[in-house]
Amino acid sequence: TPLLRVVIYDGEADENILNRIHSKISGRPNAVLIHYDEVIRNGKQNMVGPAPTQGKDVACIMYTSGSTGKPKGVILTNDNLIATIASVTMLLKPYLNQSDSYLAYLPLAHILEFVVECYMMYYGIAIGYGRVKTLTSNSVRKCEGDLVAFRPTLLVGVPAVWELIRKGIVSKVQAASATKKKLFDMSMWAKSNNIPLFKQFAESVVFKSVRAQTGGRIRYALSGGAPIARETHQFLNTALTTIIQGSVSY
């Protein structure tokens, strides 16, 4: 590659190979062929002290998706991130503890995921990593989906993911017997209308099997990125868990 300037190698390299590499980069300005041990020695001989950052220093350049125009590189400062994490703290801290676990699956190029992961790391909450395409057991073959395998207590998502989870639950219900489908519908109605006795049965029997599809331990979920559909929000609030919504459309 014409841009290559520095080659670092380790172990005992073949002299002929080193000569060939050197001949290819020797004509380039500031080109270096150096052993890893020498890199370590140079570092020890030229120690650089820590350089504390300031609030106005750039922490990240986050690119927008481009859904409403050309993607833009948004410059985020340390102050931006700290303020955002502080707002997430105000929202989530009363409900979380050290025994919680968080399943991360959105790309870190997604600002919601980036901020929430920073928060989880700051408070020492365990993070597991998955993928959108392997979240549910319906999406994979001969193995468990990420939600069932990791069994998180916290989940963050965007509308498309919540719709995927809702469809997974509905497909399981539709594949069940007529009696089980009727029980599910009655349970949704009883909980939505706060009917005490049947609501208890729904929580302990019907919805327990529904929640098993997402690992059975989710206590809270956060939705962002765009408004979640009202029907999906109400369905999952009833059948799965409380979903705190960051965007409202109704």
Specify the residue positions occupied by each region the protein language model found.
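Conserved AMP-binding A3 loop
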Residues: 59-85
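A short helix->loop->beta-strand "cap" motif at the edges of active sites that frequently abuts
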Residues: 2-6, 31, 125, 217-218, ...
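Structural core segment of the AMP-binding/adenylate-forming
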Residues: 1-41
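Conserved AMP-binding
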Residues: 105-110, 226-227
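Conserved pre-ATP/AMP-binding loop-to-beta segment of ANL
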Residues: 27, 32-34, 40-63, 70, ...
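Conserved AMP-binding/adenylation subdomain of ANL enzymes
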Residues: 82-101, 109-204, 239-240
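Short gly/Ser/Thr-rich phosphate-binding loop of adenylate-forming enzymes
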Residues: 11, 185, 189-213, 218-241
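Adenylate-forming
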Residues: 1-3, 16-20, 162-175, 204-216, ...
